[in-house]
């Protein structure tokens, strides 16, 4: 019997079945030795369910319900409107069946060869784990004693808690019936789900007949009733016994490991990657999976955007906008002047961080400098006066949280662009020296600071270019220094020495023609030549 519990019949889905989550990325299901996951994609085994395993699955479920309702699991009907469903509640006519499934989202309706049928199969495997009721699906039972405990556990649940919902329309004598889940009244003539374990008159809307723990629809209306609530088989079993997070089986041994609010068989509390025992050792939880320190650093450690080195799990880490830094004065500093920015406001710009706008402008690349044809609008934003960061919350979008390993540090960001908050990173209190030698991860692309010593900086020059006459939309006023002349004090405006003053080229309207001028006298020519000798045009 012990050899049977350790046998190869653990896999219900069959080797090579495709993964519904990963699709073509997974070559097919390859069962782990004792985990209920695929070794290729690491998805749970219910993600690899397929219609080819329906017979084995339904046979197991029929034993679970003592065979009394076998027909409802694979009920067939001569009516074409019912034959299109992979499963229908018993005792309903085609109109009532349509009324029942109309309450569900389309992706959860079990049409044959549809996403709803895959959803049903996945939920059957998840809500009613075969290894919760039959020893031949278990791989972690130690000896006949634990197999007998599993048998007694399954029989007691079947006798005291297991039931199947019955669907029927609400009659006129049951007016005022209220749904036990949402508290709303169920109208007369609408179909409702009745649970005999709950008592007479207790019913639910079809879409409200869900597990009290996971809030998922109770697949095929199979429920376990406990203390006035209905549960799926998985979560009801966890009310009675702890479940191993690694092998997904109910724990019947006298000893188990408890950490992070989860339970493990003592021998199963190991690194998810290398499977080294973690009892009494340091570990890190990621996605509900424990890792040893060396595997975690090898797989998930970040690299500092300043020095390019790996950030160890015991080193402080700052994150912002997808970038990471060591929480040290040598790494988290201004990219221009090198001043430490720990606990101070900083300005992120082009992959670098700066202490002020002046440093970011001085260290700007030629592409981002000002030119007559382009203007950096980010410098035109009106910013608030930001001081040294404190622990209290400040107003405006200029404040963003930067994550420090082990604690949250609020830093002021001199920027008006809203940035999403970064997730906190778990810290450990013990120390770990060095990084694993087998680490072969490449350093991510980073922006490095330019060599400022090889470039000569010149003062910023801003040039302006007046538009052409055809592009002038507004009037342009020019100011000139005022002067008086005794020979022209009584002349009309726009004339000088009796002659009209021509407009400059950039102020001439389209079709402008210069006013006629009289032939100058010899005296005027002499004066003009004399003036030209002492006048410079710039």
Curated annotation (Swiss-Prot):
InterPro entries, per database record: LIM1_prickle, LIM2_prickle, LIM3_prickle, PET_domain, PET_prickle, Pk/Esn/Tes, Znf_LIM
Comp. bias regions, Polar residues: 369-378, 451-463
Highest taxon, organism lineage: Eukaryota
Biased composition (Basic and acidic residues): 435-449
GO biological process, one term: cell projection organization
Keywords, in A-Z order: Cell membrane, Cilium biogenesis/degradation, Cytoplasm, Developmental protein, LIM domain, Membrane, Metal-binding, Mitochondrion, Repeat, Zinc
Subcellular location: Cytoplasm; Cell membrane; Mitochondrion
Biased composition (Low complexity): 475-488, 514-523
Record-annotated LIM zinc-binding domain positions: 177-241, 242-302, 305-366
Coiled-coil ranges (or none): none
Membrane-protein topology: Peripheral membrane protein
GO annotation, cellular component aspect: mitochondrion; plasma membrane protein complex
Entry annotated with the keyword Cytoplasm: yes
Its biological purpose: Involved in the planar cell polarity (PCP) pathway that is essential for the polarization of epithelial cells during morphogenetic processes, including gastrulation and neurulation. PCP is maintained by two molecular modules, the global and the core modules. Proteins of the core module include the proteins Frizzled (Fz), Disheveled (Dsh), Van Gogh (Vang), Prickle (Pk), Flamingo (Fmi, Celsr) and Diego (Dgo). The core module proteins develop subcellular asymmetry, accumulating in two groups on opposite sides of epithelial cells.
Family: Belongs to the prickle / espinas / testin family.
Subunit and partners: Interacts with vangl2 via its C-terminus. The vangl2-dependent membrane recruitment of prickle3 is a prerequisite for its polarization. Interacts with wtip. Wtip is involved in the recruitment of prickle3 to the basal body.
Protein's name in the database: Prickle planar cell polarity protein 3-A
Source species of the chain: Xenopus laevis (African clawed frog)
Lineage: Eukaryota, Metazoa, Chordata, Craniata, Vertebrata
